[in-house]
Amino acid sequence: MRHLIEEYGIGSQSFEAVKQVLKEQGALLQEGMILDATIMHAPSSTKNKKGEPDPEMHSVAKGDQWFFGMRCHIGVGAASGLVHSVVSTAANVHECNSAAERLHGEEKVAYGDSCHLGIEKREDFEGSSCQFRIAMRPGQRRALPDALKGWLEDLFEMAKAHLCAKVEHPFRMSKHQFGFQKTRCQSIKKNDDNLKMLFALASLYKIRK
């Protein structure tokens, strides 16, 4: 069954179908978007017929640790917290490189963590009217002056962080409720299809009431 689902891209089709229904019901508002990504570790046991690790997966450093696998980039509605877009890449692909695919072009504002700093200068967003409200780097925030201006900037950073926390819900659902903490099969495309199915279910779960 799983192979049939992967072969026909049922996960991607389900994700688009759920998204369309949510739009028609007015649940998936498009004026604001939150951008984020997470690394999906590829276990060494997931090997091809030659006994080699998946060649599409790559290593990347995050802090002082190295990870091998893929990166799942998502765009989440700032108002609804529902997943609007999913882009899967090798782990070494920077988050800014997938930003244009995660935004639909009608946003008035987009939020993201400090990994997205400088996004507004990219060619993809030249002439865009979207406001990019990207978090400061932790070191910059710690260095804010202990004065009124610094306090106000820190409050603004707190507000952005509180809003961006909405993006953690679909990641938590996919990893903990649905158990997708590591890649499940060969190829980024197949894992992407699995993830889209889970994010569709996460959106339905979120609006169940």
Describe each PLM feature range.
Residues 1-131, 137, 198-204, 209:
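Polybasic low-complexity intrinsically disordered regions
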Residues 108-109, 114-193:
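Helix-centered, glycine/charged polyanion-binding patches within enzymatic domains
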